[in-house]
């Protein structure tokens, strides 16, 4: 079966820059909505094909739906942990340390429904799993308002 291509012409893709990390490579995002009362955030992430983004830990509950491509999750050592095809939905609690990326054939687009609070959504880690940066609700809200 031919890969499905999501028409993203109307999506405003953004890069993510986090001090002291700089621009997060192989990642684009678009914040679709932020419910400021309940702290529910809807984001599209695009991960580059055959690449891995920086090591991180989700600090809040995430529901994901793969819109295009294959969503790959990797162990901290780079070993493939899971491959989620187009159309797969997954609900994951906080705490898992991993990298993410796109499959072999195309960039992956994943819808994230993030159920959080007004604190940290993601911890960015070095290869020894030390926290080197974070992405908070306030950061995501700021990105949403700046789009």
Language model features: what each stretch is:
Residues 1-39, 126-147:
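A short, N-terminal "cap"/entry segment at the start of jelly-roll beta-barrel domains
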Residues 9-14, 42, 65, 91:
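Histidine-/acidic-rich catalytic cores in large beta-rich domains
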Residues 36, 74-102:
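Short acidic-glycine-tyrosine-enriched beta hairpin
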Residues 40, 62, 107:
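Conserved catalytic motifs of the protein kinase core domain
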Residues 49, 58-77:
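Glycine- and acidic-residue-biased ligand/ion/polar-headgroup-sensing regions
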